[in-house]
Amino acid sequence: MQMLYWQYISQRFCCMDQYIIYYLFQEVFMTIREMKEALDAKFLYGEELADLDAQFVFSADMMSDVLAYCGKCSVLITGLCNPQVVRTAEMLDIVCIIFVRGKLPDENMLALARGKSIAVLATDHYMFTTCGILYEHGLRGGA
């Protein structure tokens, strides 16, 4: 079905290269392990979850924004380190939380993530840079 759709689009917009159109309609997934490597991040919890796929990303420091605007989302990028982050991620079925700017959650947060089977990564990159790197690898926003 997807193949037919991009062929239909390429016929309608003949000035666009069909490979570009096909790329636009590709679904890109990335494993948590691939994100870790791309971001030069470290696992704080969830190495056993490293092969889970993620397709969409949302970034915010206000969990009210995450709850209000995060549509389909697999990964949450934040600099906020409090238990509400893990609780919010659980409510939205997020598989991975990435803490930016070198922020590290405390042991209580990691225990909560462990109980909810949510992978936790930390990177020294700023939030904007983290989002840009994942965007370059094909992931898109989940809002």
Describe the residue ranges of each PLM region.
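N-terminal, charge-rich interaction modules
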Residues: 29-46
